[in-house]
Amino acid sequence: DAQAVALGRALRDRRGDAQINRAIREGRPLPKAKVDWMVERYTARYVKYRAEVIGRTEALRAVHQGTEEMYAQAIESGEIRAEQIERKWVTRLDGRERRTHKFLSGQKRGWGEPFATENGTIRYPGDPQAPATEVIQCRCALATRIKLR
């Protein structure tokens, strides 16, 4: 129903909830100015939320791309060999993780070996070549170990 839809939006400004409930209870529409105010508040919160999502996603991508580049340069310079690198997928298991990333948690791969999900392959959290469904708002990490022997 209309009430559930209006009050079910997480980004709404809750200061308008009482007026929505009253208007529904009394069977009358909200004044246009109030609707405009609610839409403005929702839009502002949505824009802020999207900026945060994009910022977190891109920051994660930059961190992991930089780390991958660091290891690539170390291999290229001969400081380490590719077969010495072991990467383990670490998922924050707090109930908000993707099902596909929960499955990846703890899996190990060597250098250059991608992880596989039902949506495709992913080299690391935030991988720009992976499907968006696997990277947007990802909070995973890679634990990389260099085997000395």
Positions of PLM-derived features:
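Structured, charged N-terminal subsegments at the starts of enzyme catalytic cores
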Residues: 1-43
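Activation/maturation switch segments at domain boundaries
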Residues: 36-149
